UniProtKB/Swiss-Prot annotation:
The keyword Ubl conjugation does not apply. InterPro entries: GPCR_Rhodpsn, GPCR_Rhodpsn_7TM, Olfact_rcpt, Olfact_rcpt_6C-like. It holds the Pfam family 7tm_4. Residues 45-55, 117-143, 219-239, 293-312 are cytoplasmic. GO terms for molecular function: G protein-coupled receptor activity; olfactory receptor activity. This is Olfactory receptor 6C68. Signal peptide: none annotated. It is a multi-pass membrane protein. It is found in: Cell membrane. The gene is OR6C68. Residues 1-23, 77-95, 165-197, 261-271 are extracellular. Belongs to the G-protein coupled receptor 1 family. Keywords: Cell membrane, Disulfide bond, G-protein coupled receptor, Membrane, Olfaction, Receptor, Sensory transduction, Transducer, Transmembrane, Transmembrane helix.
Length: 312
């Protein structure tokens, strides 16, 4: 995004001008943000410290938690600051940085979720070879590939964005620096970059969704062959948390990036963006902790150790 001499800052409109709604919105976002960060940090700490959680699945969960903390940190704190101070101005450079990291963390998360589905496929369909296939080196390589794939997808449209000119309007109808709202205000032609942004989003969505669907197709076929109901329940329970998180993530993003946005739907899209930025990460934390027996057991063991040390 090349800076025009007249534009060095942007104004973020946010979600509402109503003071009472802003107070409620601030409290809601602050609470959900703190719960999300606390939940993610708890998961990261448990997977690092508990020896029972030193498996590939929890290694990926640790990385997913880091990604979600990073993603929410790119936009929610800045929005909370804007609500509390009334300062809606963001500099050009800060906007570019926010856009880059939000896209990077968001796209990487999609690829990581696809990788986690492959991990579940190997664990259920090839249990005897699980630790050999999903070795520590392989897991680290797969995570690095997720980051590299995300970079390759976001850099082409972002590099084109540096050539955009902003003449008269610097008002972004959003609470953060998001690609589609930004592309509505340049005075130069944005048709090519808009197509690239949509193509990048669709490409990410389709590639990762195909991986997820294929993995779970084989998983379901394998589980249905298990002789006992108990075995089937146990196998499904190891996938339930991941399936729930995938459903929330993909379902919310379909609305914004796949469905065409009309002018009257802008406010709805902003609301969905808030859900993705704050509520989804918080829910994911509870899903992985409350529905996972090993994580719950590790959490209880950690509390017992802390209580025992405090009594000394």
């Amino acid at each position: 995004m090349r800076k025009h001499t007249a534009i060095t800052t942007f104004i973020l409109l946010g979600l509402t001008e109503d003071p009472q709604l802003q107070v409620l919105l601030f409290m809601f976002l602050f609470i959900t943000y703190m719960l999300s960060v606390t939940g993610k940090l708890t998961i990261i700490a448990l997977t690092m410290l508990d020896p029972h959680l030193k498996t590939p699945m929890y290694f990926f969960l640790q990385n997913l938690s880091f990604l979600e903390i990073s993603f929410t940190a790119t936009c929610v704190p800045r929005f909370l600051y804007s609500i509390s101070t009334g300062n809606k101005i963001i500099t050009y450079n800060a906007c570019v940085i926010q856009l880059f990291f939000a896209d990077l963390f968001g796209v990487t998360e999609f690829f990581l979720l696809a990788t986690m589905s492959y991990d579940r496929y190997v664990a259920i369909c090839k249990p005897l070879h699980y630790m050999a296939i999903m070795s520590n080196k392989v897991c680290k390589t797969m995570v690095i590939c997720c980051w590299m794939a995300a970079l390759m997808i976001i850099l082409p449209p972002l590099s084109l964005g540096f050539h955009l000119e902003f003449c008269d309007s610097n008002v972004i109808n959003h609470f953060g620096c998001d690609a589609l709202p930004i592309l509505k205000i340049p005075c130069s032609d944005t048709s090519l970059i808009e197509q690239m942004v949509v193509a990048s989003a669709v490409l990410t969505f389709i590639i990762t969704l195909v991986c997820v669907v294929l993995s779970y197709t084989y998983i379901i076929r394998t589980i249905l062959k298990f002789p006992s109901v108990q075995q089937k329940k146990k196998a499904f329970s190891t996938c339930s948390s991941h399936i729930t998180v995938v459903s929330i993530t993909y379902g919310s993003c379909i609305f914004i990036y796949i469905k065409p946005s009309a002018k009257e739907e802008v406010n709805i899209n902003k609301g969905v963006s808030v859900l993705i930025s704050s509520i989804s990460p918080m829910l994911n934390s509870f899903i992985y902790t409350l529905r996972n027996e090993q994580v719950k057991q590790a959490f209880h063991d950690s509390l017992k150790k802390i209580a025992f040390r405090l009594k000394k």
